[in-house]
């Protein structure tokens, strides 16, 4: 038999684990039942590491005792007794009268005996949270990991399981049994961090994601809290605040993040189907709120400034979808524009044809140039219709690609957007009242 085949045979032999444990204990290590079994934790199923460790120690007692008391291997019994293994302690005392002192486990120093205690504490602390699924994360002193891995290397142990992995599983099993909740590593609603060394528990509830659409009825209302004075702002609040505050109260959450499919200017209304958004509610204690109640609370508290609709639970993927579509999905607008002089009727009659599926060149608008890089964007106007209201006023209906600067398309931004409505009509723009009336959630 070759050397490689012989080594493989020894590793696969039923007595391989037994021989390794005997050698380790006789070399002066003391291992608790769990740490003993964990040395071969990746071998087989159906046994806990504690059960596996006790089984190995039981077999070693049988080996130590042999055929009769006179032939007993007292040294092997002593090292087994020092691990705290009661059958070995009792047998040693009976055979030799010795009562050896129990040594702390050379790897965990007693930490594996804390699983049930920490699980109970986690269950108690989790009572104030709503959840159906959970997972357990483990923190442990680096010295424990070092001792464990050093033992693996020294004795060539290739099927050992880490104490961190064992603790996560065993504490999770206890919590699941005590609460009836499901242990899940995927999409868990509550992450329970167990610090084995410090004996501490941390709870981290997963965010709740709520999809919806908002209509903005008031001009002068920013989407998010505005950091500096702005003459366009007419209200001491924002769309985000009007939506977030009621949600925090109902979900008993610490904070929330507001994700919208783009944004309208402060002086622009959003009507029609509304603007899609996702509310990411962080560290919620409640997860199963009736969203009709949330919508009513938001709408009644908004005083007519905004309205939310179509609220539904969703997940993080929807945020990515909203962000990715914001620059390409089709949007529709109605703009009421006042010009410097009377509008040419013939030109106005041609405008729909000229700007049907037209590609517009837009440099970064002057009004945002201080905070955005100056670059050229090519965007599409799919449809443009015009209705004359008075000699110098026109109402336009536009359907455009997402990320399109509508105001600049109307007034031209001193040539930074071309072609523009003002350029085509040969007429300067004095004022614009703009409304968003439709935002699609699929690319045009």
Swiss-Prot record:
<dbReference type="InterPro" id="IPR039894">
    <property type="entry name" value="Pus10-like"/>
</dbReference>
<keyword id="KW-0413">Isomerase</keyword>
<comment type="function">
    <text>Responsible for synthesis of pseudouridine from uracil-54 and uracil-55 in the psi GC loop of transfer RNAs.</text>
</comment>
<dbReference type="GO" id="GO:0160148">
    <property type="term" value="F:tRNA pseudouridine(55) synthase activity"/>
</dbReference>
<dbReference type="GO" id="GO:0031119">
    <property type="term" value="P:tRNA pseudouridine synthesis"/>
</dbReference>
<dbReference type="Pfam" id="PF21238">
    <property type="entry name" value="Pus10_C"/>
</dbReference>
<dbReference type="InterPro" id="IPR055174">
    <property type="entry name" value="Pus10_THUMP_arc"/>
</dbReference>
<dbReference type="GO" id="GO:0000049">
    <property type="term" value="F:tRNA binding"/>
</dbReference>
<feature type="active site" description="Nucleophile">
    <location>
        <position position="265"/>
    </location>
</feature>
<dbReference type="InterPro" id="IPR020103">
    <property type="entry name" value="PsdUridine_synth_cat_dom_sf"/>
</dbReference>
<keyword id="KW-0819">tRNA processing</keyword>
<dbReference type="InterPro" id="IPR048741">
    <property type="entry name" value="Pus10-like_C"/>
</dbReference>
<keyword id="KW-0694">RNA-binding</keyword>
<feature type="binding site">
    <location>
        <position position="405"/>
    </location>
    <ligand>
        <name>substrate</name>
    </ligand>
</feature>
<feature type="binding site">
    <location>
        <position position="333"/>
    </location>
    <ligand>
        <name>substrate</name>
    </ligand>
</feature>
<dbReference type="InterPro" id="IPR005912">
    <property type="entry name" value="Pus10"/>
</dbReference>
<protein>
    <recommendedName>
        <fullName>tRNA pseudouridine synthase Pus10</fullName>
        <ecNumber>5.4.99.25</ecNumber>
    </recommendedName>
</protein>
<comment type="similarity">
    <text>Belongs to the pseudouridine synthase Pus10 family.</text>
</comment>
<dbReference type="Pfam" id="PF22023">
    <property type="entry name" value="Pus10_THUMP_arc"/>
</dbReference>
């Amino acid at each position: 038999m070759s050397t490689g085949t012989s080594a493989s045979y020894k590793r696969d032999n039923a007595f391989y684990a037994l021989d390794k444990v005997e050698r380790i204990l006789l070399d002066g290590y003391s291992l608790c039942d769990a740490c003993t079994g964990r040395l071969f934790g990746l071998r087989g199923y159906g046994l806990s590491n504690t059960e596996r460790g006790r089984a190995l120690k039981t077999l070693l007692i049988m080996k130590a005792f042999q055929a009769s008391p006179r032939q007993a291997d007292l040294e092997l019994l002593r090292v087994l007794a020092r691990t705290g293994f009661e059958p070995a302690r009792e047998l040693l005392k009976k055979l030799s009268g010795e009562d050896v002192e129990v040594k702390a486990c050379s790897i965990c120093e007693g930490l594996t005996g804390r699983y049930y205690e920490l699980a109970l504490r986690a269950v108690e602390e989790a009572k104030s949270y709503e959840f159906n699924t959970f997972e357990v994360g483990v923190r442990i002193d680096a010295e424990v990991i070092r001792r464990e891995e050093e033992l693996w290397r020294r004795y060539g142990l290739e099927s050992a399981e880490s104490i961190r992995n064992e603790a996560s599983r065993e504490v999770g099993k206890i919590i699941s049994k005590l609460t009836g909740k499901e242990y899940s590593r995927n999409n868990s609603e509550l992450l329970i961090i167990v610090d084995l060394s410090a004996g501490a528990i941390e709870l981290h509830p997963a965010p709740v994601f709520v999809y919806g659409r908002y209509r903005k009825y008031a001009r002068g209302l920013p989407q998010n809290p505005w950091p500096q004075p702005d003459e366009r702002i007419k209200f001491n609040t924002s769309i985000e605040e009007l939506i977030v505050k009621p949600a925090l109260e109902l979900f008993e959450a610490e904070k929330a993040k507001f994700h919208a499919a783009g944004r309208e200017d402060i002086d622009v209304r959003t009507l029609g189907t509304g603007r899609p958004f996702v509310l990411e509610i962080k560290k919620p204690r409640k997860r199963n709120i009736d969203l009709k109640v949330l919508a009513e609370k938001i709408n009644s508290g908004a005083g007519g400034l905004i309205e939310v609709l179509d609220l539904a639970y969703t997940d993080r993927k929807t945020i990515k979808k909203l962000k990715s579509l914001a620059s390409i999905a089709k949007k529709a607008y109605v703009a009421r524009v006042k010009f410097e002089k009377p509008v040419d009727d013939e030109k106005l009659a041609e405008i729909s044809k000229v700007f049907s599926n037209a590609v517009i060149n837009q440099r970064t608008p002057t009004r945002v140039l201080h905070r955005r890089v100056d670059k050229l964007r090519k965007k599409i106007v799919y449809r443009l219709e015009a209705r004359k209201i008075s000699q110098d006023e026109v109402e336009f209906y536009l359907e455009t690609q997402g990320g399109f600067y509508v105001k600049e398309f109307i007034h031209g931004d001193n040539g930074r957007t071309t072609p523009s409505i003002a350029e085509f009509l040969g007429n300067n723009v004095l004022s614009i009242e703009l409304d968003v009336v439709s935002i699609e959630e699929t690319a045009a």
